[in-house]
């Protein structure tokens, strides 16, 4: 006969040794259904801290960035504490915050291609195509990329002020204080995967590889993004599980 109390005690012991503490959601799940608690912890290991291609510090910083982008306050603190336990300094934590902010701000470009015709219709102008091409050419040359996101060109057509601000943001927010440049792009990529903005995910992934990133490292980042994104449901259910 299965002893649920022993099962949850084993999970708690292992959680404390790997996470530093027992996540509240796993503890609460264990009260209601031990199998669901075990599944939650298994995912934590397989999709997060059990990954082996990225340093634990980078895994936790990536999880922190994705949690910040998803507004998961309780998870943010857990991943912050883990990052500190794995040796992250505050400048590296700030890099994680910057990567999350950049990805979220860039995601607003997802509507630019759709609203561009409306802007053109009601402004009575069709944009300066030569100037847009010049700006986009400069961005392409500076980035070293073969192609640029379609929505970036649409943003330039909608507003030169906004494209200039976007370039300034990218220069400031994706220039790391302490982490390797490739990890800055990897964190931004993971956030873009989580918020489902394809164009930025492709751009940041390309820049990650251009800065020496490996496919196996990208796989780990995708796993973390999947785990943290799905985990938003569980952390949001905490008050329900307390009943």
Positions of PLM-derived features:
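Hydrophobic alpha-helical segments
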Residues: 1-243
């Amino acid at each position: 006969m299965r002893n649920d109390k022993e099962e949850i005690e084993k999970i708690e012991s292992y959680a404390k040794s790997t996470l530093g503490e027992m996540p509240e959601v796993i503890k609460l799940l264990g009260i209601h259904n031990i199998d669901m608690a075990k599944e939650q912890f298994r995912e934590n290991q397989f999709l997060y801290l059990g990954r082996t291609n990225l340093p634990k510090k980078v895994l936790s910083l990536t999880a922190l960035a994705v949690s910040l982008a998803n507004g998961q306050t309780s998870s943010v603190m857990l991943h912050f504490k883990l990052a500190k336990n794995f040796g992250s300094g505050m400048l590296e934590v700030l890099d994680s915050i910057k990567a999350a902010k950049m990805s979220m701000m860039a995601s607003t470009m997802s509507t630019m291609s759709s609203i561009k015709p409306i802007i053109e219709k009601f402004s009575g102008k069709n944009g300066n195509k030569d100037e847009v091409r010049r700006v986009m050419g400069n961005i392409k040359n500076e980035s070293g990329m073969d192609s640029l996101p379609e929505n970036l060109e649409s943003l330039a057509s909608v507003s030169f002020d906004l494209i200039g601000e976007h370039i300034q943001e990218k220069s400031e927010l994706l220039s790391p204080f302490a982490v390797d440049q490739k990890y800055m792009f990897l964190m931004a990529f993971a956030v873009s995967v989580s918020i489902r903005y394809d164009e930025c995910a492709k751009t940041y992934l390309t820049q990650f590889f251009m800065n020496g990133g490996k496919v196996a490292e990208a796989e780990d980042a995708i796993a973390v993004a999947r785990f943290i994104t799905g985990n938003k449901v569980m952390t949001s259910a905490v008050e329900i599980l307390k009943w």
